Amino acid sequence: MSLLGLAAIQTAAEAGGNFDLVEREIRSVAKRFPWVSMVAIGELAIHGSSIDLAEPAGGPTEQRLSQLAKETGLWIIPGSLYESRDGKIFNTTPIIDSAGDIVARYDKLFPFLPYEKNVSSGSDYVVFDAPGGAKVGVVICYDVWFPEIIRTLCALGAEVILVPTMTNTIDRDVELAIARANAAISQCYVVAINVAGEQGVGRSAVYGPGGECIHEAGAGREILALELDMQQVRNARERGWHGLGQVLKSFRDMPVAFPMHESVAARQKAMKNLGALEMPGPIQHDRPPTDAATEPKPKLTIIKKKGPA
């Protein structure tokens, strides 16, 4: 049996520091759920979304997280942190094992442009061996909108995809639909961990390898402690979910190539007519501007109501 005991912690993130709260939540998981071997939290949940709080790799936040991992015996996936390296800032997820070692770093491939305009894109995919024989991949928030990433991670062996997220906008419903679809089309677990409080609307969710919703959280603080069975992933990929579509095999065996994906240049050429990726400006109306002095005034109709006789 290949089980991963995972706790997804939906913290109440504030614009300032949340590290003390995060640490209490992690220590609580270690006491309440002794079968859990890994905890994960939402994107930027520890320090918030200001790049002014970026630290160098191996800085004080990572050091404190490493010590916490050693003390609790848990693998810690601390959402993400803004990290400064080589004169650039990355939105980074350090993967910390139960001995407190950083076994990998994942840099967000798709910063949420144009809003994360000063954050550099990563270049590497990360899949790591986790307790229970699971293979786990990581993406960050907006990355999940690009199914090519999820399928690449699964081609590298991933059976669980962690998606730390910080979303406080109206598109959370869309994000959940995308996460669910990715679970189904790549036949894997998808754990979409949002933050609550000032900087997130919550609604973290876990989907199984058939796209089934295992649990969706509410809007407030919550801990989603689950046993994820890797055999279910392997069965779905081998036999199809409940004996239905064997999606990855079909994708593998299809003899047709995707021209747009042959190179970066081919992709850029295919979508060159979309215009620049920039902040949307004011909404422009079709009605031409007029001079206020000459613009006709709207006709005003007044109806006088007679009083009682």
Identify the meaning behind each predicted range.
Residues N18-D20, V29, E71, G122, ...:
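Eukaryotic scaffold repeat domains enriched in small/polar residues
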Residues A13-R105, T169-A184:
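Cys-nucleophile CN-hydrolase/nitrilase-fold catalytic domain and related Cys-dependent amidase chemistry
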Residues M1-L6:
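Extreme N-terminal starter segment of soluble prokaryotic enzymes
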Residues A7-I9, A40, I77, A104, ...:
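Hydrophobic/aromatic beta-strand patches that form the interior of the parallel beta-sheet core
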Residues A57-W75, W145-L224:
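CN hydrolase (nitrilase-like) catalytic-core segments centered on the catalytic cysteine
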